[in-house]
Amino acid sequence: MDIFEYDGKFYSYFSYWDGLNFTKKVLDKFAVKFESELSTREKEIIRAARKSSYIITLAENGAKSTRRHEFSHAFSFTDKAYKTKVFEIVESIPKELRDKFVSGLEGMGYSIGDPAYENEEIQAYLVGYDQKEYRSFFPLILPEEVAPYVASIGEVYAKKESEVLV
């Protein structure tokens, strides 16, 4: 998808997002649904991902926080032990702070109501913590409120990253 329309305006993919993640199952559904409309480039991407279980897309010059965010989703999807550890950290967040996260996610257009999905996004935003982004995405959250969780989850992420990304 090179260009898409949102709210009456047209965007190129990476002018709107630095990164995105999805499962191979989602890609397969997309390929079947739009088979007759796929561009040559889209067909090549689908072919290249055929042996993957999880796909991450990143802008070449995207933010480091986005890279960490997207890889945290991949680690959570592909490594049960990693997911268990990061979800334990997320679930230790006090309700008042969690509500601030959920409010921010909802404000960004995330679907709210499934605690597991919310945990997944919260862990990814903790891993990809960027204070400037937080002021925009989570204006109700103060840096000192989130610091211990950023540190704890950052340790788990760094260990996994060192095992996987060389």
Per-range role (PLM):
Residues 59-62, 72, 80, 131:
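Short, flexible loop/turn elements at secondary-structure junctions
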Residues 1-53, 159, 163-166:
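A metal-dependent hydrolase signature that marks the N-terminal structural subdomain at the beginning
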Residues 65-78, 124:
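Active-site recognition of the HExxH zinc-binding catalytic motif
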Residues 53-68:
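Short pre-active-site segment immediately N-terminal to the catalytic Zn-binding motif
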Residues 75, 83-85, 134-135:
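Short catalytic/ligand-binding loop motif for oxyanion handling, primarily in non-cytosolic enzymes
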Residues 48-54, 91-166:
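Metalloprotease/metallohydrolase-associated module, dominated by Zn2+-dependent proteases
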